[in-house]
Amino acid sequence: MAHKKGASSSSNGRDSESKRLGVKRFGGQQVKAGEIIVRQRGTKFHPGENVGRGGDDTLFALAAGSVEFGVKRGRRLVNIVPAEEAAAEATA
């Protein structure tokens, strides 16, 4: 095996593809059922009302409505306020 590198070879130049993690829908935004709200590794955000959690810890909407972020018992939660409730609160 050669102990000197041949011309123009490099041991660099490899990296993994970015995973595009993060919050996809922010507080106050309207979502439809099934829309992804947060892509994450581990449970940085926990599912709250009307929010489901996928096998890769992705949070998604179970109902149409407005996204709401909050904290409960030191955990960051993501809730969906259903569209009917949001309309009722606005008129009240």
UniProtKB/Swiss-Prot annotation:
Gene Ontology CC, one term: cytosolic large ribosomal subunit
Keyword Transport belongs to the record: no
Record key words, sorted: Ribonucleoprotein, Ribosomal protein
InterPro entries membership: Ribosomal_bL27 (IPR001684), Ribosomal_bL27_CS (IPR018261)
Stretch list, region Disordered: 1-26
A molecular-function term among this protein's GO annotations: structural constituent of ribosome
Pfam family, one: Ribosomal_L27
Chain coiled-coil ranges: none
GO aspect biological process, one term: translation
Protein name as catalogued: Large ribosomal subunit protein bL27
Species for this entry: Corynebacterium aurimucosum (strain ATCC 700975 / DSM 44827 / CIP 107346 / CN-1) (Corynebacterium nigricans)
Taxonomic lineage of the native organism: Bacteria, Bacillati, Actinomycetota, Actinomycetes, Mycobacteriales
Gene symbol of the encoding locus: rpmA
